[in-house]
């Protein structure tokens, strides 16, 4: 029997895209927490349901940041929070720094995921040059959970710049 399954954690991006009629929704909010953080190596491995405020505070404690500057759209989308890292990657959400630094998918080094058949699979690793063949990270980011459900992701981080200027 074929069913249409939706994937969500905090449902902060539910207003994006077209309306969907799901038979069931898989809530992945339990896939949460920092698995491994190596500030000296600029590598962060975490579960996909980890809230963005936790990701940002962890990185700030080591004076680091995500290069792709996650846009905080929670007020525009009428959601309670900025969401999770899995939602950011599933939508490839990237802010104004995308023009110079790149998108979220450019900093996804590797991931563990669950396919539509319920099978676990891995792609990539913990270093920048780790892909031979298809780079599934580039494909999965921005797929809105239609190709796979992220379980664990490894991201490249960057040191925070000493100065920061905003132009309004």
Each model region followed by its residue ranges:
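N-terminal glycine-rich flavin-associated loop
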Residues: 1-7, 28-81, 89, 93-126, ...
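Glycine-rich beta-strand-to-loop/alpha-helix junction loops that act as flexible
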Residues: 7-13
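Short glycine-biased active-site loop of nucleotidyltransferases that positions the nucleotide triphosphate
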Residues: 14-20
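Short, well-ordered secondary-structure micro-motifs within conserved domains or adaptor modules
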Residues: 21-26
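Internal, glycine-rich beta/alpha segment that forms the wall or movable "lid"
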Residues: 134
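Short, acidic (Asp/Glu-rich) active-site segment that either coordinates a divalent metal cofactor
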Residues: 139-162
